[in-house]
Amino acid sequence: MKRRVGGLETEYGLVCVRADGSRALEPEAAARELFRPVVAMGRSSNVFLRNAARLYLDVGSHPEYATAECDDWWELVAQDRAGDRMFAELAAEATERLAADGQDARIHLLKNNVDSAGNAFGSHENYLVDRRGEFTRLPRYLLPFLVTRQIVTGAGGVVRPAPADGAPEQEAGPAQFVFSRRSDHMWEAVSSATTRTRPIINTRDEPHGDPTRFRRLHVIVGDSTMSEVSTHLRFATTDLVLRAIESGRALPELALHDDIAAIRAVARDLTGTTAIPTADGGTTTAIEVQQRWLDHVTEFADESEQDVLETWQRGIDAVRTGDRSWAATHLDWAIKERLFHQVAERRGVDLGDPAIERLDLAYHDIDPTQSVFAALQRRGLAPQVLDEQRIERARTTAPTTTRAHLRGQVVTAAQEHGVDHVVDWTTLRLTRPGAMPVQVLDPFATELPAVDALLEEIRASAAGAPESPPPFA
Protein backbone atom coordinates (compact mmCIF):
# COMPACT_ATOMS: atom_id res chain seq x y z
CA MET A 1 0.00 0.00 0.00
CA LYS A 2 1.90 3.00 -1.32
CA ARG A 3 -0.50 5.50 0.22
CA ARG A 4 -1.48 4.59 3.75
CA VAL A 5 -3.80 6.15 6.31
CA GLY A 6 -2.73 6.15 9.94
CA GLY A 7 -3.61 7.67 13.27
CA LEU A 8 -2.28 8.02 16.79
CA GLU A 9 -4.14 7.54 20.08
CA THR A 10 -2.53 9.09 23.16
CA GLU A 11 -3.53 8.43 26.76
CA TYR A 12 -2.35 11.12 29.17
CA GLY A 13 -1.40 10.67 32.78
CA LEU A 14 -3.50 12.90 35.04
CA VAL A 15 -2.53 14.25 38.43
CA CYS A 16 -3.88 17.11 40.55
CA VAL A 17 -1.53 18.37 43.26
CA ARG A 18 -1.18 21.18 45.79
CA ALA A 19 1.72 23.60 45.82
CA ASP A 20 3.60 21.30 48.22
CA GLY A 21 3.25 18.36 45.81
CA SER A 22 0.62 16.46 47.79
CA ARG A 23 -2.47 15.15 46.02
CA ALA A 24 -5.30 17.68 45.89
CA LEU A 25 -7.94 15.70 44.00
CA GLU A 26 -8.44 12.05 43.16
CA PRO A 27 -8.08 11.29 39.43
CA GLU A 28 -11.84 10.85 38.96
CA ALA A 29 -12.60 14.29 40.43
CA ALA A 30 -9.76 15.91 38.51
CA ALA A 31 -11.00 14.33 35.28
CA ARG A 32 -14.51 15.66 35.86
CA GLU A 33 -13.14 19.16 36.34
CA LEU A 34 -10.89 18.85 33.30
CA PHE A 35 -13.75 17.73 31.04
CA ARG A 36 -16.31 20.26 32.26
CA PRO A 37 -16.07 22.43 29.08
CA VAL A 38 -16.10 19.31 26.89
CA VAL A 39 -19.32 18.06 28.47
CA ALA A 40 -20.82 21.55 28.22
CA MET A 41 -20.05 21.60 24.50
CA GLY A 42 -21.09 18.09 23.51
CA ARG A 43 -23.11 16.85 26.50
CA SER A 44 -20.61 14.02 26.68
CA SER A 45 -17.01 13.35 27.65
CA ASN A 46 -16.55 11.71 24.25
CA VAL A 47 -16.57 14.20 21.36
CA PHE A 48 -15.33 14.60 17.81
CA LEU A 49 -13.80 17.99 17.07
CA ARG A 50 -13.63 20.36 14.11
CA ASN A 51 -10.25 18.89 13.16
CA ALA A 52 -12.01 15.47 12.97
CA ALA A 53 -10.10 14.13 15.97
CA ARG A 54 -11.69 12.41 18.93
CA LEU A 55 -11.18 13.77 22.45
CA TYR A 56 -12.54 11.69 25.29
CA LEU A 57 -12.20 10.29 28.79
CA ASP A 58 -11.11 6.67 28.64
CA VAL A 59 -11.59 3.93 31.21
CA GLY A 60 -9.63 4.64 34.40
CA SER A 61 -9.93 8.44 34.16
CA HIS A 62 -7.37 8.65 31.36
CA PRO A 63 -7.83 11.69 29.12
CA GLU A 64 -7.27 10.50 25.56
CA TYR A 65 -6.88 12.11 22.16
CA ALA A 66 -7.07 10.24 18.87
CA THR A 67 -5.88 12.09 15.79
CA ALA A 68 -7.92 12.13 12.63
CA GLU A 69 -6.89 9.90 9.74
CA CYS A 70 -3.66 11.14 8.12
CA ASP A 71 -1.80 9.99 5.00
CA ASP A 72 1.13 12.32 5.63
CA TRP A 73 3.22 11.60 8.73
CA TRP A 74 4.21 15.21 9.36
CA GLU A 75 0.52 16.12 9.26
CA LEU A 76 -0.06 13.39 11.84
CA VAL A 77 2.59 14.96 14.07
CA ALA A 78 0.88 18.35 13.70
CA GLN A 79 -2.50 16.83 14.57
CA ASP A 80 -0.96 15.07 17.57
CA ARG A 81 0.60 18.31 18.80
CA ALA A 82 -2.76 20.03 18.36
CA GLY A 83 -4.21 17.52 20.81
CA ASP A 84 -1.48 18.37 23.31
CA ARG A 85 -2.31 22.06 23.01
CA MET A 86 -6.03 21.52 23.51
CA PHE A 87 -5.55 19.37 26.58
CA ALA A 88 -2.97 21.79 27.99
CA GLU A 89 -5.52 24.61 27.74
CA LEU A 90 -8.23 22.48 29.32
CA ALA A 91 -5.87 21.75 32.22
CA ALA A 92 -4.97 25.43 32.63
CA GLU A 93 -8.63 26.45 32.61
CA ALA A 94 -9.52 23.75 35.13
CA THR A 95 -6.71 24.95 37.40
CA GLU A 96 -8.04 28.51 37.15
CA ARG A 97 -11.54 27.37 38.09
CA LEU A 98 -10.20 25.47 41.09
CA ALA A 99 -8.24 28.54 42.20
CA ALA A 100 -11.33 30.74 41.83
CA ASP A 101 -13.09 28.25 44.08
CA GLY A 102 -10.37 28.72 46.70
CA GLN A 103 -8.64 25.39 46.12
CA ASP A 104 -4.88 24.94 46.18
CA ALA A 105 -4.76 22.59 43.21
CA ARG A 106 -3.01 22.36 39.85
CA ILE A 107 -3.91 19.80 37.19
CA HIS A 108 -1.01 18.29 35.27
CA LEU A 109 -1.32 16.17 32.13
CA LEU A 110 1.67 13.99 31.37
CA LYS A 111 2.39 12.56 27.94
CA ASN A 112 4.33 9.58 29.17
CA ASN A 113 3.73 5.85 29.55
CA VAL A 114 4.44 4.99 33.20
CA ASP A 115 3.78 7.02 36.36
CA SER A 116 5.53 6.88 39.72
CA ALA A 117 3.12 4.18 40.91
CA GLY A 118 3.85 1.95 37.93
CA ASN A 119 0.54 2.60 36.14
CA ALA A 120 0.88 2.38 32.37
CA PHE A 121 -0.67 4.63 29.71
CA GLY A 122 -0.83 3.83 26.02
CA SER A 123 0.39 5.37 22.82
CA HIS A 124 -1.37 3.36 20.15
CA GLU A 125 -0.53 3.52 16.45
CA ASN A 126 -3.03 2.61 13.75
CA TYR A 127 -2.13 1.69 10.18
CA LEU A 128 -4.53 0.87 7.36
CA VAL A 129 -3.69 -2.43 5.65
CA ASP A 130 -5.32 -4.29 2.78
CA ARG A 131 -7.84 -6.92 3.88
CA ARG A 132 -6.67 -9.08 0.97
CA GLY A 133 -3.16 -9.24 2.34
CA GLU A 134 -1.99 -12.01 4.63
CA PHE A 135 -2.54 -10.35 8.01
CA THR A 136 -1.34 -13.47 9.81
CA ARG A 137 1.99 -13.09 7.99
CA LEU A 138 2.60 -9.57 9.26
CA PRO A 139 3.71 -10.35 12.84
CA ARG A 140 6.45 -12.75 11.73
CA TYR A 141 8.31 -9.94 9.99
CA LEU A 142 7.02 -6.88 11.80
CA LEU A 143 7.66 -8.03 15.39
CA PRO A 144 11.49 -8.01 15.22
CA PHE A 145 11.33 -4.47 13.89
CA LEU A 146 8.89 -3.32 16.59
CA VAL A 147 10.88 -5.01 19.37
CA THR A 148 14.09 -3.23 18.36
CA ARG A 149 12.94 0.16 17.02
CA GLN A 150 13.07 1.53 20.58
CA ILE A 151 16.80 2.12 20.06
CA VAL A 152 15.73 4.94 17.75
CA THR A 153 12.20 5.95 18.76
CA GLY A 154 12.06 5.08 22.48
CA ALA A 155 11.16 7.78 25.00
CA GLY A 156 13.89 6.72 27.44
CA GLY A 157 13.56 6.44 31.18
CA VAL A 158 14.93 4.97 34.39
CA VAL A 159 14.12 1.58 35.91
CA ARG A 160 15.29 0.03 39.15
CA PRO A 161 15.35 -3.77 39.48
CA ALA A 162 12.98 -5.07 42.13
CA PRO A 163 14.62 -6.50 45.28
CA ALA A 164 14.65 -10.25 45.75
CA ASP A 165 11.63 -11.75 47.50
CA GLY A 166 11.64 -10.70 51.13
CA ALA A 167 14.61 -8.35 50.71
CA PRO A 168 14.36 -4.70 51.83
CA GLU A 169 13.85 -1.99 49.23
CA GLN A 170 17.38 -0.67 49.70
CA GLU A 171 18.76 -3.95 48.40
CA ALA A 172 17.24 -3.44 44.96
CA GLY A 173 19.79 -3.21 42.16
CA PRO A 174 21.08 0.14 40.92
CA ALA A 175 18.82 2.31 38.81
CA GLN A 176 19.46 2.04 35.09
CA PHE A 177 18.64 4.20 32.11
CA VAL A 178 16.71 2.33 29.40
CA PHE A 179 15.53 3.03 25.88
CA SER A 180 11.90 2.42 26.85
CA ARG A 181 10.04 1.86 30.12
CA ARG A 182 7.06 0.69 28.09
CA SER A 183 8.93 -2.56 27.33
CA ASP A 184 8.36 -3.83 30.88
CA HIS A 185 4.61 -3.53 30.39
CA MET A 186 4.37 -5.79 27.33
CA TRP A 187 3.26 -9.35 28.06
CA GLU A 188 2.43 -10.93 24.72
CA ALA A 189 3.62 -10.57 21.15
CA VAL A 190 0.19 -10.77 19.53
CA SER A 191 -3.21 -10.76 21.22
CA SER A 192 -6.70 -9.29 21.05
CA ALA A 193 -6.30 -7.82 24.56
CA THR A 194 -5.10 -4.27 25.30
CA THR A 195 -4.63 -4.04 29.07
CA ARG A 196 -4.42 -7.13 31.25
CA THR A 197 -2.19 -9.11 28.84
CA ARG A 198 -0.90 -6.13 26.89
CA PRO A 199 0.51 -7.23 23.50
CA ILE A 200 2.89 -5.61 21.05
CA ILE A 201 0.33 -6.00 18.24
CA ASN A 202 -3.37 -6.00 19.01
CA THR A 203 -5.37 -8.20 16.64
CA ARG A 204 -8.91 -7.11 17.49
CA ASP A 205 -10.58 -6.70 14.11
CA GLU A 206 -12.09 -3.20 14.09
CA PRO A 207 -11.29 -1.78 10.64
CA HIS A 208 -13.16 1.56 10.96
CA GLY A 209 -13.69 1.22 7.23
CA ASP A 210 -15.06 -1.13 4.60
CA PRO A 211 -14.46 -4.54 6.23
CA THR A 212 -14.29 -6.24 2.83
CA ARG A 213 -11.35 -4.05 1.76
CA PHE A 214 -9.49 -2.88 4.83
CA ARG A 215 -8.10 -3.95 8.15
CA ARG A 216 -6.60 -1.78 10.88
CA LEU A 217 -3.20 -2.77 12.23
CA HIS A 218 -3.18 -1.71 15.89
CA VAL A 219 0.33 -1.36 17.36
CA ILE A 220 0.35 -0.63 21.09
CA VAL A 221 4.02 -1.04 21.98
CA GLY A 222 5.08 2.52 21.18
CA ASP A 223 6.28 5.16 23.61
CA SER A 224 4.62 8.56 23.92
CA THR A 225 7.24 10.85 22.47
CA MET A 226 7.65 14.59 22.96
CA SER A 227 10.14 15.03 20.12
CA GLU A 228 8.48 15.64 16.76
CA VAL A 229 11.39 13.80 15.14
CA SER A 230 10.79 10.70 17.27
CA THR A 231 7.04 10.69 16.62
CA HIS A 232 7.54 11.12 12.88
CA LEU A 233 10.11 8.32 12.77
CA ARG A 234 7.77 5.90 14.53
CA PHE A 235 5.23 6.18 11.74
CA ALA A 236 7.45 6.79 8.73
CA THR A 237 9.75 3.82 9.40
CA THR A 238 6.89 1.46 10.27
CA ASP A 239 5.09 2.47 7.07
CA LEU A 240 8.19 1.63 5.01
CA VAL A 241 8.52 -1.77 6.69
CA LEU A 242 4.85 -2.50 6.03
CA ARG A 243 5.29 -1.60 2.37
CA ALA A 244 8.19 -4.02 2.10
CA ILE A 245 6.17 -6.80 3.74
CA GLU A 246 3.18 -6.11 1.49
CA SER A 247 5.33 -6.24 -1.65
CA GLY A 248 5.51 -10.03 -1.50
CA ARG A 249 9.25 -9.98 -2.16
CA ALA A 250 11.86 -11.81 -0.12
CA LEU A 251 12.25 -10.32 3.36
CA PRO A 252 14.88 -10.38 6.10
CA GLU A 253 14.35 -13.53 8.18
CA LEU A 254 14.77 -12.11 11.68
CA ALA A 255 12.04 -13.83 13.72
CA LEU A 256 12.97 -13.86 17.41
CA HIS A 257 12.81 -16.80 19.79
CA ASP A 258 10.98 -14.82 22.51
CA ASP A 259 9.73 -11.35 21.59
CA ILE A 260 8.88 -10.35 25.17
CA ALA A 261 12.23 -11.40 26.63
CA ALA A 262 13.90 -9.64 23.71
CA ILE A 263 12.06 -6.34 24.13
CA ARG A 264 13.15 -6.15 27.78
CA ALA A 265 16.74 -7.05 26.95
CA VAL A 266 16.92 -4.48 24.16
CA ALA A 267 15.57 -1.75 26.45
CA ARG A 268 18.40 -2.28 28.94
CA ASP A 269 21.29 -2.49 26.48
CA LEU A 270 22.27 1.04 25.46
CA THR A 271 24.96 -0.35 23.13
CA GLY A 272 22.43 -2.24 21.02
CA THR A 273 24.73 -5.26 20.91
CA THR A 274 23.17 -7.74 23.36
CA ALA A 275 22.73 -11.12 21.68
CA ILE A 276 19.05 -11.80 21.02
CA PRO A 277 18.13 -15.45 20.36
CA THR A 278 16.36 -15.95 17.03
CA ALA A 279 13.72 -18.51 16.13
CA ASP A 280 16.16 -20.45 13.93
CA GLY A 281 18.59 -21.05 16.80
CA GLY A 282 20.98 -18.21 16.02
CA THR A 283 21.37 -14.75 17.50
CA THR A 284 21.06 -11.18 16.34
CA THR A 285 21.27 -7.70 17.88
CA ALA A 286 19.00 -4.68 17.96
CA ILE A 287 21.41 -2.75 15.76
CA GLU A 288 21.52 -5.57 13.21
CA VAL A 289 17.73 -5.86 13.01
CA GLN A 290 17.26 -2.13 12.51
CA GLN A 291 20.10 -1.86 10.01
CA ARG A 292 18.88 -4.80 7.94
CA TRP A 293 15.38 -3.37 7.77
CA LEU A 294 16.70 0.08 6.87
CA ASP A 295 18.84 -1.37 4.09
CA HIS A 296 15.94 -3.48 2.84
CA VAL A 297 13.31 -0.72 2.65
CA THR A 298 15.53 1.75 0.81
CA GLU A 299 14.09 0.68 -2.55
CA PHE A 300 10.55 1.36 -1.32
CA ALA A 301 11.26 4.97 -0.32
CA ASP A 302 10.61 7.73 -2.83
CA GLU A 303 12.54 10.96 -3.13
CA SER A 304 10.46 12.71 -0.48
CA GLU A 305 11.32 9.99 2.04
CA GLN A 306 15.10 10.16 1.79
CA ASP A 307 15.19 12.31 4.92
CA VAL A 308 13.43 9.48 6.79
CA LEU A 309 16.16 7.04 5.78
CA GLU A 310 18.86 9.52 6.75
CA THR A 311 17.33 10.25 10.16
CA TRP A 312 16.78 6.54 10.81
CA GLN A 313 20.44 5.87 9.99
CA ARG A 314 21.62 8.66 12.28
CA GLY A 315 19.58 7.15 15.09
CA ILE A 316 21.10 3.70 14.57
CA ASP A 317 24.59 5.18 14.33
CA ALA A 318 24.13 7.03 17.63
CA VAL A 319 23.75 3.66 19.34
CA ARG A 320 26.36 1.83 17.27
CA THR A 321 29.13 4.42 17.78
CA GLY A 322 28.15 5.83 21.16
CA ASP A 323 28.33 9.33 19.66
CA ARG A 324 25.13 10.96 20.92
CA SER A 325 25.86 14.48 19.67
CA TRP A 326 23.04 14.49 17.09
CA ALA A 327 20.63 12.17 18.91
CA ALA A 328 20.91 14.14 22.17
CA THR A 329 19.15 17.09 20.55
CA HIS A 330 16.67 15.16 18.38
CA LEU A 331 15.55 11.82 19.86
CA ASP A 332 13.71 11.61 23.18
CA TRP A 333 15.71 8.78 24.72
CA ALA A 334 19.03 10.48 24.00
CA ILE A 335 17.82 13.93 25.08
CA LYS A 336 16.73 12.46 28.42
CA GLU A 337 19.84 10.32 28.81
CA ARG A 338 22.08 13.37 28.61
CA LEU A 339 19.78 15.53 30.74
CA PHE A 340 19.38 12.94 33.50
CA HIS A 341 23.09 12.25 33.77
CA GLN A 342 23.88 15.98 33.82
CA VAL A 343 21.39 16.63 36.63
CA ALA A 344 22.46 13.55 38.60
CA GLU A 345 26.12 14.56 38.38
CA ARG A 346 25.41 18.16 39.34
CA ARG A 347 23.38 17.07 42.39
CA GLY A 348 25.67 14.23 43.35
CA VAL A 349 22.91 11.60 43.17
CA ASP A 350 22.32 8.44 41.17
CA LEU A 351 19.61 7.90 38.57
CA GLY A 352 17.34 6.34 41.18
CA ASP A 353 17.04 9.59 43.12
CA PRO A 354 13.49 11.02 43.40
CA ALA A 355 14.73 14.21 41.76
CA ILE A 356 15.35 12.30 38.53
CA GLU A 357 11.90 10.76 38.67
CA ARG A 358 10.37 14.22 39.07
CA LEU A 359 12.49 15.45 36.17
CA ASP A 360 11.20 12.61 34.01
CA LEU A 361 7.59 13.52 34.78
CA ALA A 362 8.25 17.22 34.16
CA TYR A 363 9.83 16.38 30.80
CA HIS A 364 6.51 14.90 29.67
CA ASP A 365 4.26 17.65 31.09
CA ILE A 366 2.31 19.10 28.16
CA ASP A 367 1.89 22.53 29.82
CA PRO A 368 4.46 24.69 27.97
CA THR A 369 5.01 26.74 31.14
CA GLN A 370 5.84 23.62 33.18
CA SER A 371 7.36 21.25 30.62
CA VAL A 372 11.08 20.54 30.74
CA PHE A 373 10.92 19.46 27.11
CA ALA A 374 9.39 22.81 26.11
CA ALA A 375 12.16 24.59 28.02
CA LEU A 376 14.76 22.58 26.11
CA GLN A 377 13.07 23.55 22.85
CA ARG A 378 13.27 27.23 23.74
CA ARG A 379 17.00 26.80 24.37
CA GLY A 380 17.57 24.96 21.10
CA LEU A 381 18.34 21.68 22.89
CA ALA A 382 15.32 19.80 21.52
CA PRO A 383 13.84 19.82 18.03
CA GLN A 384 11.00 22.02 16.85
CA VAL A 385 10.32 21.02 13.25
CA LEU A 386 6.76 22.24 12.80
CA ASP A 387 6.03 25.94 12.91
CA GLU A 388 3.42 27.33 15.28
CA GLN A 389 1.06 28.24 12.45
CA ARG A 390 0.80 24.64 11.30
CA ILE A 391 0.10 23.33 14.79
CA GLU A 392 -2.50 26.04 15.42
CA ARG A 393 -4.16 25.31 12.08
CA ALA A 394 -4.35 21.61 13.00
CA ARG A 395 -6.44 22.48 16.06
CA THR A 396 -9.42 23.47 13.94
CA THR A 397 -8.68 22.04 10.49
CA ALA A 398 -8.89 18.37 9.59
CA PRO A 399 -6.44 16.74 7.18
CA THR A 400 -7.71 17.50 3.67
CA THR A 401 -6.56 14.32 1.90
CA THR A 402 -8.48 11.68 3.87
CA ARG A 403 -12.00 10.94 5.13
CA ALA A 404 -11.22 13.25 8.05
CA HIS A 405 -11.92 16.20 5.72
CA LEU A 406 -15.58 15.16 5.42
CA ARG A 407 -16.02 14.58 9.15
CA GLY A 408 -14.38 17.90 9.92
CA GLN A 409 -16.70 19.72 7.51
CA VAL A 410 -19.80 18.21 9.12
CA VAL A 411 -18.69 18.85 12.71
CA THR A 412 -17.68 22.42 11.89
CA ALA A 413 -20.92 23.22 10.07
CA ALA A 414 -23.07 21.61 12.75
CA GLN A 415 -21.30 23.47 15.56
CA GLU A 416 -21.38 26.80 13.74
CA HIS A 417 -25.12 26.50 13.10
CA GLY A 418 -26.05 24.93 16.42
CA VAL A 419 -27.35 21.70 14.87
CA ASP A 420 -27.28 18.57 17.04
CA HIS A 421 -25.30 15.77 15.47
CA VAL A 422 -23.56 12.48 16.15
CA VAL A 423 -20.43 11.31 14.36
CA ASP A 424 -17.92 8.52 14.72
CA TRP A 425 -15.08 7.25 12.54
CA THR A 426 -17.37 6.01 9.77
CA THR A 427 -20.79 7.59 10.34
CA LEU A 428 -22.23 11.13 10.19
CA ARG A 429 -25.77 11.84 11.37
CA LEU A 430 -28.06 14.61 12.57
CA THR A 431 -30.02 13.79 15.70
CA ARG A 432 -33.42 15.04 14.53
CA PRO A 433 -36.25 12.48 14.02
CA GLY A 434 -36.03 10.66 10.71
CA ALA A 435 -32.45 11.69 9.97
CA MET A 436 -30.58 9.05 7.98
CA PRO A 437 -26.93 8.31 8.76
CA VAL A 438 -24.28 8.83 6.12
CA GLN A 439 -21.58 6.18 6.08
CA VAL A 440 -18.07 6.93 4.83
CA LEU A 441 -16.33 3.56 4.67
CA ASP A 442 -13.45 4.63 2.43
CA PRO A 443 -10.71 6.25 4.57
CA PHE A 444 -9.35 7.95 1.42
CA ALA A 445 -12.64 9.62 0.47
CA THR A 446 -12.56 13.44 0.38
CA GLU A 447 -15.76 14.01 -1.62
CA LEU A 448 -19.14 12.33 -1.28
CA PRO A 449 -22.51 13.55 -2.61
CA ALA A 450 -24.27 12.27 0.50
CA VAL A 451 -22.03 14.44 2.67
CA ASP A 452 -22.68 17.46 0.44
CA ALA A 453 -26.40 16.87 0.93
CA LEU A 454 -25.92 16.57 4.68
CA LEU A 455 -24.07 19.89 4.76
CA GLU A 456 -26.91 21.53 2.84
CA GLU A 457 -29.39 20.05 5.30
CA ILE A 458 -27.40 21.50 8.21
CA ARG A 459 -27.38 24.97 6.66
CA ALA A 460 -31.07 24.81 5.78
CA SER A 461 -32.15 23.58 9.20
CA ALA A 462 -30.25 26.41 10.84
CA ALA A 463 -31.49 29.19 8.56
CA GLY A 464 -32.06 32.30 10.63
CA ALA A 465 -30.55 30.81 13.77
CA PRO A 466 -27.60 32.64 15.36
CA GLU A 467 -24.23 31.01 14.85
CA SER A 468 -22.76 29.22 17.82
CA PRO A 469 -19.40 30.48 19.06
CA PRO A 470 -16.42 28.22 18.34
CA PRO A 471 -15.96 25.57 21.05
CA PHE A 472 -12.72 25.16 22.94
CA ALA A 473 -9.95 24.28 20.48
From Swiss-Prot:
Catalytic residues in the record: D58 (proton acceptor)
Ligand binding (Mg(2+)): E9, Y56, E64
Classification via HAMAP family: Pup_ligase (MF_02111)
Listed EC numbers: 6.3.1.19
Catalytic reaction equation(s): ATP + [prokaryotic ubiquitin-like protein]-L-glutamate + [protein]-L-lysine = ADP + phosphate + N(6)-([prokaryotic ubiquitin-like protein]-gamma-L-glutamyl)-[protein]-L-lysine
Biological process annotations from GO: modification-dependent protein catabolic process; proteasomal protein catabolic process; protein pupylation
Record-given protein name: Pup--protein ligase
Function per UniProt: Catalyzes the covalent attachment of the prokaryotic ubiquitin-like protein modifier Pup to the proteasomal substrate proteins, thereby targeting them for proteasomal degradation. This tagging system is termed pupylation. The ligation reaction involves the side-chain carboxylate of the C-terminal glutamate of Pup and the side-chain amino group of a substrate lysine.
Residues engaged in binding ATP: R54, T67, W425
Keywords: ATP-binding, Ligase, Magnesium, Metal-binding, Nucleotide-binding, Ubl conjugation pathway
Pathway membership: Protein degradation; proteasomal Pup-dependent pathway; Protein modification; protein pupylation
Family: Belongs to the Pup ligase/Pup deamidase family. Pup-conjugating enzyme subfamily.
Further facts: The reaction mechanism probably proceeds via the activation of Pup by phosphorylation of its C-terminal glutamate, which is then subject to nucleophilic attack by the substrate lysine, resulting in an isopeptide bond and the release of phosphate as a good leaving group.
TM region positions: none
Residues of the signal peptide: none
Gene Ontology MF term list: ATP binding; ligase activity, forming carbon-nitrogen bonds; magnesium ion binding; ubiquitin-like protein transferase activity
